[in-house]
Amino acid sequence: MLILASASQSRKKLLENCQIEFIQISSNFDETTIQEKNIFNLALELSFQKANSLSENIQNISLPEEFNYGPLEILGCDSIFEFKGEAYGKPSNKEEAFIRWKKMSGEFGFLHTGHTLIIGHFDSTSKIFKITEIIKKTVSSRVYFSKLEDWEIKSYVDTNEPLYCAGGFALEGIGGKYIEKIEGCFSNVMGLSLPWLRENLYRS
């Protein structure tokens, strides 16, 4: 059984569309405690900490009965957009989102998603989660943006969508029409590489 250690609605929808049985529980890990400067490594470390935080507190969570038997997988993910060597998280306000889009217009950047899958067994009697394997990887996709006029950028920013997305855009949302092409894993840009998950899920 799979637990998605994330509050992300886009990751939730990806799993639902693939008909993967799971439950979603936010890990509530404080991301500001990680000081890693390498963007590629930062995405991976954050994904691990999210999954690990949930695994350490799983005894305090009320799980469905079917989660008490057999293997249990905890999936942590974190996405960071890299533009010319700079990490772009979620814009703090509309002004910042507009400035970023002015820079990204007609250019390309990289969406890095760190993935961590913690595999183990949960004993409902002892309330102990025994880890048997940890699988980690950062998957990167190159994203090309259309050349936009200022009014187009403003129109998009005014939807508020950029304020809730790593990099300030959502491929599966309104922002999708401003993306020319993607090199690499498509679903990775939405926060979860489905090919990576297929290769590693249920290995136990």
UniProtKB/Swiss-Prot annotation:
Subcellular location, record wording: Cytoplasm
EC class of the enzyme, as a word: hydrolase
GO biological process: nucleotide metabolic process
Xref: NCBIfam families: maf (TIGR00172)
Keyword field contains Hydrolase: yes
Cross-referenced InterPro entries: ITPase-like_fam, Maf-like
Domain of life: Bacteria
Function: Nucleoside triphosphate pyrophosphatase. May have a dual role in cell division arrest and in preventing the incorporation of modified nucleotides into cellular nucleic acids.
Species whose genome carries this gene: Prochlorococcus marinus (strain MIT 9215)
Catalytic activity: a ribonucleoside 5'-triphosphate + H2O = a ribonucleoside 5'-phosphate + diphosphate + H(+); a 2'-deoxyribonucleoside 5'-triphosphate + H2O = a 2'-deoxyribonucleoside 5'-phosphate + diphosphate + H(+)
Requisite cofactors: a divalent metal cation
Active site positions: 78
Family of the protein in this entry: Belongs to the Maf family.
Location (main, coarse): cytoplasm
HAMAP family for this protein: Maf (MF_00528)
This enzyme's EC code(s): 3.6.1.9
Keyword vocabulary terms for this entry: Cytoplasm, Hydrolase, Nucleotide metabolism
Name of the protein described by the UniProt record: Nucleoside triphosphate pyrophosphatase
One term under GO cellular component: cytoplasm
One Pfam family from the record: Maf
Keyword field contains Transcription: no
Gene Ontology molecular functions: nucleoside triphosphate diphosphatase activity
